[in-house]
């Protein structure tokens, strides 16, 4: 083989096993398909066997789809000086008819070909600090989801046993909690309610403690300025701002705002054929966590008048540079006005919120890249 040979190694990775295949441009199909136990050392041995075939001077590039293994395998291979790429699954080329027959060997061959023909987008590899912060925030969100589920279970239990709170319109206020603790039921029912309330108290305390920790993380030098800037936008508090920054990492890797919103799966799909063109719902391709955060943030634009600033927003904006505040005010006014205009034109609230989330993503990209003009 000549010195310019590049060997592409597709890896279909799972918890228990890796299936590997190699491909060189000019060959008809990937070769040397092999299934091995899930161990990066065995991947290195596989590559060493290929070196005896293609030579030491050839370039070797491994790749696998983003999935349950995260970045662990990538870091192992890179530490052993082996080039590795993580492929975004939603961007990979699909061969017609192949999707109906899915095996590990086929997937490994497909990945090898995608690497060779560059028919994919690589996954951004976060810094170690970003990855730790991201995992911490996701852990907190999991516990918040447990808290929400526990609240729903308590309300369902109360309703099944004729306990209906009518003192105020809202649940989980001080009045509601006092009422909940004062209920007297027969036998095991009382024990069930007590256990539910005990679990609720534990989860509430845990979430509050984690929120304080996230607040402290957002004050780190690497994040403080960016978090301060993002919190000038309506609906984005420090935990949300920190989560977006840690999840995305380098905003400069997106050349345009539209690329960033597409990365989050917030752009509408399209079905075009001949003269016909049909707009579809959002693609939902990309980072689901940030997409959910921005859709939740967009809901805040449905509360308050155009141009109105709450006391909390004014406090968050205080101390930021004038150009940042002016940019945020422009975004806030435009998004709030757009929301009410869409409702006036008969659009459903959820459609309007999703449209706002897409545009909010564009404003976030502009702020992180200092596009204040």
Indicate where each model-derived feature is located.
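Short glycine-rich, Thr/Ser-proximal phosphate-binding strand/loop in the N-terminal lobe
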Residues: 15-42
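Short, basic/hydrophobic alpha-helical segments
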Residues: 40-60
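Basic, amphipathic alpha-helical segments enriched in Lys/Arg and hydrophobic/aromatic residues
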Residues: 337-373
């Amino acid at each position: 083989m000549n010195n310019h040979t590049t060997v592409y190694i597709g890896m279909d990775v799972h918890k228990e096993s890796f299936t590997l295949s190699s491909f060189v441009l000019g060959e008809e199909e990937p070769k040397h398909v092999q299934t091995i136990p899930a161990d990066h050392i065995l991947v290195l041995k596989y590559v060493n066997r290929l070196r005896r075939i293609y030579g030491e001077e050839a370039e070797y590039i491994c790749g696998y789809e983003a999935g349950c293994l995260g970045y662990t395998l990538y870091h192992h291979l890179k530490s052993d000086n082996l080039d590795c790429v993580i492929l975004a699954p939603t961007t990979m080329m699909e061969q017609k008819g192949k999707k109906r027959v899915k095996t590990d060997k086929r997937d490994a061959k497909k990945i090898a070909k995608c690497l060779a023909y560059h028919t994919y987008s690589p996954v951004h590899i976060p810094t170690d600090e970003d990855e730790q912060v991201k995992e911490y925030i996701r852990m907190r969100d999991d516990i918040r989801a447990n808290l929400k589920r526990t609240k729903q279970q308590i309300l369902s239990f109360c309703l099944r046993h004729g306990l209906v709170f009518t003192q105020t319109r809202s649940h989980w206020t001080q009045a509601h909690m006092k009422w909940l603790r004062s209920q007297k039921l027969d036998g095991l029912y009382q024990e069930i309610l007590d256990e539910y309330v005990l679990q609720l108290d534990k989860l509430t305390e845990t979430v509050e403690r984690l929120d304080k920790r996230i607040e402290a993380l957002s004050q780190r030098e690497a994040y403080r300025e960016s978090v301060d800037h993002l919190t000038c936008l309506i609906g984005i508090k420090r935990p949300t701002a920190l989560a977006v920054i840690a999840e995305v990492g380098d905003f400069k890797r997106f050349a345009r705002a539209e690329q960033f919103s597409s990365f989050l799966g917030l752009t509408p799909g399209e079905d075009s054929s001949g003269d016909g063109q049909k707009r579809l719902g959002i693609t939902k391709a990309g980072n689901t966590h940030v997409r959910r955060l921005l859709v939740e943030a967009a809901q805040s634009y449905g509360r308050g008048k155009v141009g109105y600033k709450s006391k909390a927003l004014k406090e968050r904006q205080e101390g930021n540079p004038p150009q940042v505040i002016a940019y945020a005010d422009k975004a806030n006014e435009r998004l709030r006005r757009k929301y009410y205009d869409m409702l006036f034109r008969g659009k459903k609230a959820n459609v309007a919120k999703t449209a706002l989330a897409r545009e909010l993503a564009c404003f976030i990209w502009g702020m992180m890249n200092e596009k204040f003009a």
